[in-house]
Structures are given as C-alpha cells and as structure tokens.
Amino acid sequence: MQTIQLFIENTRVDLFKDESVTITDTIKNIKDISKVFTTFSQQFSLPASSTNNLIFRHYYNYDIVNGFDARARVNATIKLNGVDFKQGKIKLNNVALKNNKPYAYKIVFYGKAVDLKDIVGEDKLNNLQFIEVKDSGTCTLTSANKLTDFGGSFTTTTSEGDRVHNVDDGTYATVLSVDSNQQLTLNADIFAANDDYRVLLSPIWENDSVEEKLQLQPATAKNTLIVPLITHTKRLYYDSSTNIAGDGNLYWHGGGGTHDHGVAYTDLKFALRVHSIIEAIENTYSDIEFTTDFFNTTNYNYYNLYMWLNRKSGEVSTSTSVNSFQFTVDSWSGGDLNEGGAGLGSTYGITSDFADFGTSFSMSIADSTTAYTIEFFKNQSLVYTTSRTASQGAYTLGTAELGAISTMAGTWHVVISANANVIISNISITLQGIIFDEFGGTSSYTNTITSGNINTPAVATFDIADQMPEIKVIDFINGLFKMFNLIAFVNDEDKIEVRTLDNASSDSYYNLSNVNTYDITEYVDVKESQVDVALPFKEVNFTYEDLKTFLAVNHEQLFNQSWGTEQWNEDSDTLRIDGQSYNVKLPFSHMKYERLINQDNGVDTSIQWGWSVNENQDSYKGKPLLFYPLRNSGTPIQFLVNGGSDQITQYIIPSNSRYLNDTSGEDNINFGPEINEYDRPLTSFSGTLFQNYYYNYITNVFRFNARIIKLTAYLPLRIILNYKLNDYIVVSGKKYRINSIKVNLLTNKSELELITT
C-alpha cells in the first residue's frame, strides 16, 4: 500500500486512516460513443478535523456568513507517495454528523476536463467577446475616399466590406478595395491626416458591405466574415429567356431599366469562420486555452468551415425601427476579477454575487446633446431601460434600477439607440464592498469599469455577437466534438488538448508517437475475468438535429433517406444483429444545396445556392448552419443595387464539400456518402465525416470477433502513475485498447475494461 495525499486549493487535507479512494479513468467509452469522459472518483470521506473544518469553513454550520460554497467545484490534486497522480476538482456532497457534531465531509473528485462546462455555464454564443478590432493606426495623408497609413499592413489585416471607424469624429465607412498595404478605398470620405482609425469585424449593414463580402476568397485567412449565396426567403433561379420584375432570376441582363430582378443585399446574410468562434471562446474565458493540435489554420476540414449568421428567420434585424440605429458600447476597460468585476470589449462582467450588506453599486452616465434610449442587459435579458432628452444632464443608476447587489453576477452589456449620432463622454460603473478571507478577516475594495468616450454611428451595424445563432457555448463545442470524433483533456501545460480519436492523422490520439505498451500479464488476478460483446448496439446512426429546410425535406421524400446521414451496422440477408440503436446527433442544421441550370436551355451554370425555408417555403430559422464556402466564377449573376444592378462574375457558393469535383478531393460534412450537388457527372463523395473520423473506431468494435475483456489486476505504482488512455495493454501476448480503468489508490486493485484490437 502507498500513501494517498489530497490537496484542496494547495492545502493538504486530513484523510481517514486506510480510507479507500477509487478512481475511474476513461476518455472515450464504447458504451456511449458520442461523449468525451474524464476522471472521476467514487464518493469518499474526509474527517471533520480542524484542518478540514477550516478548508470547508464549517459547512455544517449554515449560520456562518460567506462560508464554503458547495455549489461550485474547487481545485484539487491527488498525490501517491508524494508524486502527482491526478489534478482536477472536488465537489462537497454532504457533511455526516454524529451526536449532532461533524464527523465527515463526503466528496467526489473529478478530472480537469470537466472544467469546460463549469467555466462556460449556460452562456450562449451571443455572450462571447469577439475580437472586434482587426487593425488600427493613424491616417497619414488626406485623400478623398481613401484611408492611407504609410505604416499600414492592410493586405494581411483588412478585407473588402469591412467597417472602418474614424475614432476622432465617430464616422464610419465601408472598405471597397484594399489597394495596398498602405491604402484602402472607402465608400465615404471620412479621413484627414492625423485621424486615428480602427478596422472592425462587425460591418455596416448596407449594400456595399454585402456586395464586397459576397466576392471574397474564403480560403484567405483575413476573410473571417463573408457572404454566401444563401437566401432567407427569396427563391433564386436562372433563366436567360425571362424578365420578371423583383423575382430571383440571377441572369445578368445588362443592368438598369426594367431588368430589376436578381439578388439584393437584404436577401442575404453574413457568415463567420468557425475558427473565429473558437478564438472568441478563448478570448472570453481566461481559463480556456485550446491546443492547436486540431484547432489550427492548416486543418482545412475544420478551418474552412463557416457558420451562417441566421439569428432569426427572414430579413436581418439591426435596429428597433427604420430610423433608429443601435450601438453596443464596445470599449469597457478596467476591473479586477478578484474583486468581482471585469471590463472587456462589448461586455462587462460581474463574476460573483455579493452580500447586500457592506456593498454598493452605481452607474454614472455623462450627458449628451442628442436624445437617445439606453438599455441594460444581463445575460442577454433586458434589466432596465430609460430614454433621455437632449442635454437632460448626467445621471446615476443604482440597485433601484438594476437590481439587488445579491443578483448582480452575470455578463452585462449596454445598448444605445438613437435617430442620430450620440456622444457620451463616459459611462462609469463602480462596485464597492468588503471581501471576507478564509480566516474571517475583511478588506475593502473599490472596483471601477469605464467605457471612455462613446461616439455612436448613425448607421445600421451588423453586430457579430448579437447576430450569432441561438446555441449554448457548451452545446456548440460538443457539436464540434461529435462532428469530428474529438477527445479533450487538460495537458501538463494546463491547456485543453483537443485531438481526433482515431483517424489517419499522426496527430490523432491513438496514433501519437508517445503511445506506450504495458504488459500486465504478471499482475492479473487469474481467478476472475469476463468477456463481453464489444458493442451493445445493433447499429449506430449519425445525423444532424435539423434536416428541415426545403431541399433536405424534399430529398428524404424522394429517396426515403435523410440527407447526409449514415446508419452503420453489419446486417445482411443472413445475419440480423441484436441490440438497440445508438444515435450520434449534431446540434446543427444541414442543408442540401442546388446547382442552378439555365431553365431556357438546360445548361449547367456555375451557381450553387442555399434556401433557408421550410417545407411550406416560409422563412426558416432552424439550428446553426455549418458549411464550406467556395468562391466560384463562370456564370455572372445580377446583384440589385438601388434601383439598378451590378454584374458579379465571382461569388461565394455554399457547399457541403471542400471541393466542387472529386478529382480535387472528396472531404465533406455529410455522414454518409451523397451525390455531390455541384459535380458533373453526378458523383458520390466518399470522404464523409464517418469515413474520415469514425470508421476505424466503429468498425473495430463491430467486428464479429471484437470483445470487451474485463479483468482485475494489481498494477504497480510505476504503471498507475504513468499510463495514458491511448496506451496499449498486453495480456498473455494479446494487445488491447483501454476502454476504462478503475483503480483503488490504497490497494492498487485495478478493474480494467479492454477492447480487442
């Protein structure tokens, strides 16, 4: 037996003599294919000693103010003979009393990977702090409709369609062209020499920004925001022989006159690179940092994915009325996380609730010469709103308007709406109070967050955060994990290491160069073992949660098969496998796209489009849509512009495949092989999500001779301290993968579930 040591927040706790601590370790369990697991323990007890009472702040006494919060998990480390075994968190379940006195604290230990859900909580994608500023500097030359910066790097930072902000006077313009590293052409004359500027991610919602971003090359790193040819309502088609005013005929008639058909900017919406959402998650939560083993810029199956920003069905909504423009204050700074508040970007956070006693909260808003309405949101829910007339004076809000101190915790943002430009010199938020330390002592603090000068634009802005589809951050992450069969664990550098489980890549978890092999034959208890069927399912179904757009529904009706799905089993005419079905379902929408033909002569065009309507052809919101945007050319399309039209010769089409023909590549985001919507002749692309990311793992356990071997062994400490879940285990000359290990840390008794290879 060895010595077990448990540290909670770096303090060693007292253990009962001979207390048994049993740890279960698994990362991917064949009994629950779609989930990523982590280490956890059975409940065990700690004595109510003076040391432990101090750590848990006498939790049994509920009259203690500012005591231990058992709702949250706290950092912990398990050591064996002084050597680190596992790091993670403990959760206090209850306190056992004997004779009305505390006897034992009952806790459970969890591995570090569980932190992810603890950190992001119930936050949604629109709670994220996106990296809004793409570039900044000072204009060095006055030139009409130009932004010139002799020290600029526009060719690597700025995209056509981006919003440019004159910081000095609060005006905005859209980038029409990136002329060079030092110069941009804009759609408005807003800069003079020595004016400071910012290039921003969230664009102006107008014709110019949409038209420019419809023509970008999505494969270029700086083009994180694009516009695909996906309409929210209008049906697009191509017919060189007809001319119906206002409809979706994309045929280019030469522009102007009566040829007012085609696609308008209001028919379309922006899309954001999925990698930018991952970066926003890291930017929002300081405790989350992913490794680049999977989330990197050269993993194109991932990096080339975009999410369509379809927050609501139908047209984009950016303001409360036609003449009122909204602006989210995006310049918060200051604050101290240790004191409960933090200011950053478009939101400011209050990280914990405070006792009403001894704490005060106030918000001071400077005067403005323009009438406006201001709204205060907590976790995206409106808390308070008020309207101010021009030059009404500065004013202060407090708990009467914003709620009790004890309910302040959350992510806050402020939205200003007005019919004209609003200038407010500062919004100042002050949180004052008393902090109780673990020894009962107190200290006072003052925490101030400021916005600085606010200069709102009188333009409709497509705010990226506000336009994100409605999905929880944790559900989005889990969706990506299911999509690519990913695993995650916290590595020795305290980063969240994300990898594919088992595919052809050398970066795959099962294929890493540091995989070891342990022969445990001599440690196995030969008196007891068990051989189980490897897979308790007759089939595994892979699908998307939302297959309800018009063309996807039509596909199922025509072929009696859901679009892009896979049903894997080993059934045949002479063999019917017994068991239940297991479903791997992504929380995303999956569209079927359409390559247009010229209805006049039946010739294929180079146009492919998506239609976000339901079976009744009504605008459809659906789940978040992921797709590959591809810039294509060949057939010009007609883009409506202020009563006329522009000819666009290259444009972004949506695709489920990374390539438009199988000779270039067949990787796609269907689970099962489907006829590619664009390729001619009609070709089924085999590089599916199942084939690329699940095939090795699933087919191994579906083999007729696949087994799960359950056995007991008394493993030596050198193996217990060093094994990894991708290591091989050898028993009697046969090699196995680890499904799970349960280890009694006191006796070294280990119960192993092993999968045949």
Spans of model-derived segments:
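Noncatalytic modules at the cell exterior or secretory-pathway interfaces
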Residues: 403-420
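A short beta-strand element within beta-rich, extracytoplasmic domains
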Residues: 348-368, 434, 726
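Solvent-exposed serine/threonine-rich low-complexity stretches and specific carbohydrate-binding patches
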Residues: 382-393
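Short beta-strand-centered aromatic/proline hotspots
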Residues: 86-95, 171-178, 734-744
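Short, solvent-exposed secondary-structure boundary/capping segments
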Residues: 94-111, 179-192, 745-757
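Conserved aromatic beta-strand anchor motif in extracellular beta-sandwich/beta-rich domains
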Residues: 78, 166, 374-378
